Each structure stands twice: as C-alpha cells, then as structure tokens.
C-alpha cells in the first residue's frame, strides 16, 4: 500500500450485488483490505461506508487523482463509468482537467482545462469533442442547465479573482461561449458560488457570496 506500492482492488459484479443487497437502511458497510506480497503482510486498511438507498441511471462522471488508467500516481483528470461497465474510461486528463459539471441529460460537460485559467465545454454525444474553449474560468464548476444549452459561471472559484480571468457571475451559451444578457441576474448577482439548476430548469440554487455572508 502507499505511494511507493499502489494497489487496486476491483470487486466483481456478484460481490457488488451482495454488498448493495446487504447494506440496507442505516446499516453501515465495513470494508477491510490486507495486502500479501513476497511473504510480507501489509494492512489491514479498514473503512466504513454508508450505501445510499436507490439507483443511479445513466453515466457517472467524476474527478480522479492518481489513477493507473490515466497514468499513475501523478495523474489527474475526469473519468466516466457507464451502466453495467466494470472499468471506468478517461474523458479528459492533465492538470486542471478535474473541476467539471455535467448536464442532467448527459449531452454536455463544462470543465476547467488548465491552472490557473482556462475552461471549455464538451459534446458528450460526440466523444467529448470541444464545443467552446475559453481563456478564463467561466465554465469551471459552472451551474449547467439540464439540457446543456447554457451555464451560469461559479464565482469564488478563480472565476472572479483578479488576475485569473473571468469576472462576476454571468450566463453563457455553452456552444458559442457568448454571454447571454440576463436582466434579472446581471448587476444583481455578483458572486454566485456552486450554482445548480433544478431538474426541470425552473430554479437555480447557489451561495450568494456578495451579500448575506454566503447564504443560499
């Protein structure tokens, strides 16, 4: 175990089924892993997991660090796991390619592309082809509309800090990168941290950091 000797354990489908079937209600799941190599025993490493009740539909996109699939201990990037798949696949890799948001319909992803500045939107229906690339962080951790058409920039994550590009929270077209004039938002909301749309796109929630001490 550890950085000098990383190990990966991949439970079988049957094992995951048994785990999820057994972990019901509020019962926690305890996982203990011991490594045996060359006559030496390392561990155990023990963790307690709480399995959420319910099912997830569609593809899951997530940030990853140090994955052997992306290149090992120093790698960073975005990966995805598809329904019934046993192994994740890379979407984007490299420094900065972790801070992302995917649209609810699975069509569009927005993400950081570089540090300290750079972001882009991607077409998830076309092998994550770039839709629009920006030299600032307007798309980084943005609140993306359910159909992927627009994104509200997430302030207080490099987007409005002087020197990092970007500015006050704005609404952008994910395909063109153009700013969409929004009278009810522009000049009213300046710092909108962690924005997220409701599933029907009728509401948006965020931490308003320009007033109210960051209250939602």
Regions found by a protein language model. Give the residues of each.
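Signal that preferentially marks extracellular ectodomain short beta-strand elements
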Residues: 2-26
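Internal, hydrophobic beta-strand segments that form the core of beta-sheet-rich folds
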Residues: 24-38
């Amino acid at each position: 175990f550890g950085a000098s000797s990383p190990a990966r354990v991949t439970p079988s489908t049957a094992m995951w089924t048994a785990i999820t079937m057994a972990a019901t209600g509020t019962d926690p799941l305890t996982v203990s892993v011991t490594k045996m190599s060359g006559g030496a025993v390392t561990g155990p490493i023990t963790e307690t997991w709480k399995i959420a009740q319910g099912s997830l539909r569609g593809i899951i996109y997530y940030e990853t660090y140090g994955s052997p699939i992306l290149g090992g201990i120093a790698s960073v990037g975005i990966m995805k796991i598809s329904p019934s798949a046993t192994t994740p696949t890379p979407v984007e890799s490299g420094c900065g390619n972790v801070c992302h948001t995917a649209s609810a319909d699975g069509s569009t992803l927005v993400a950081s592309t570089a540090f300290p500045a750079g972001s882009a939107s991607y077409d998830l229906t076309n092998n994550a082809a770039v839709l629009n690339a920006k030299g600032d962080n307007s798309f980084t951790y943005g609140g993306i509309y359910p159909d992927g058409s627009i994104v509200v920039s997430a302030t207080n994550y490099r987007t409005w800090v002087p020197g990092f590009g970007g500015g006050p929270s704005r609404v952008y077209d994910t395909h063109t990168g153009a700013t969409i004039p929004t009278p009810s938002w522009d000049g009213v909301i300046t710092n909108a941290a962690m924005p997220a749309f409701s599933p029907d796109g009728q509401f948006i929630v965020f931490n308003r950091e320009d007033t109210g001490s960051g209250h939602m």
